[in-house]
Amino acid sequence: MSFAKFSYDETTHNQVVNHPRAHENTLRGIEYLQKQGIFTSVNMVISQANFDHLYQTGVFVSNLGVESFSTAQAIPSQAGGKSHLQQALTPEQIPEYLEALHHIREDTGMFVKLTNPVPFCSVWESRPHLRYLLETSTCTAGRTIIQIDPSGQVKPCPMINNGYGNILEEGLDVVWQRMTPWSDNAYVPETCQPCDLVERCRGGCRAEAERTCGSLAAKNPFSIKPVKLSPIQEPNHNLPIGTKMVVTRNLRARKEQADLYVLFTKDRYMVTRENVARFISAIHTKGSLTIDEKLAQDRGAIETLALAYNAGILRKAA
């Protein structure tokens, strides 16, 4: 179960939620579920009201025993007017925001991810060690997710106001076909088309672009410029010699088809080939894997370990 936590600080959390006992009630709920053996995670929406609280909040919830921490930059609502726009992050804050989340992972060992996408170009070239965070979230609106309200009205995502019909009256097939522009990337900005990352990034959050720039197809305010990938990519990981890797608790595997497996546990998963699944299974059987000089020279093995680590399937031992 996921809990919303807006700050480690009781006063700030209560102010954002607008309830005098919100902090107390949230902590009580986390503690109760943990005692029942139920997995708990925390999501933090980041705005100007709590931007400086991110790192300390991550450490705070880790000390509560939370194993998974996600964040999302606040998306201004259309009803909120200028006051909501003033709470949105600035382009200059995005690198600092991602750095804080990265340090939470490095310092606590928690699995971290984004729940609102950030344009990949925002830090792809300037801070390559943050690329894994960008890849934890992309726009899935009308592609792999839809929102259905209690009356059956369908939207491509909770933050998009455009309706596409009623699933109870017309059925899923009819409504789904109306959302074809989303799967066809019709709202990906023209300025993003030359980018080598466009199929993975899709221009960032379209609701964010609409609220701040006026159109679903507008350039996201955090976009910088198209990225051109080098044929030879430099290694992008933080797994130095001496790093001890262990398999995340309660990891399970499911065979999807020949030579294709899904490794999953709690709120994370990794789709991979059989040889990688066996490699990770061997780490689990052995108990751990320590990166030595020989292994560090095996780029393929290190990249596999980095992928599994970034997906939350492996973690660094304390």
Predicted regions and their residues:
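Radical SAM enzyme [4Fe-4S]-AdoMet core and its adjacent flexible, acidic
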Residues: 2-151, 155-159
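C-terminal accessory region of radical SAM enzymes
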Residues: 92-126, 153-203, 209-212
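N-terminal [4Fe-4S]-dependent radical SAM core
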Residues: 131, 177-180, 260, 269, ...
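Active-site lining segments that contact anionic ligands and/or coordinate catalytic metals
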Residues: 143, 149-151, 192, 202, ...
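Short cysteine/histidine-rich metal-coordination sites, predominantly Zn2+-binding motifs
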Residues: 208-225
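Short Fe-S-cluster ligation motifs
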Residues: 220-250
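Short alpha-helical segments that sit at the start of domains
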Residues: 249-277
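Long, charge-rich, low-complexity alpha-helical segments
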Residues: 268-318
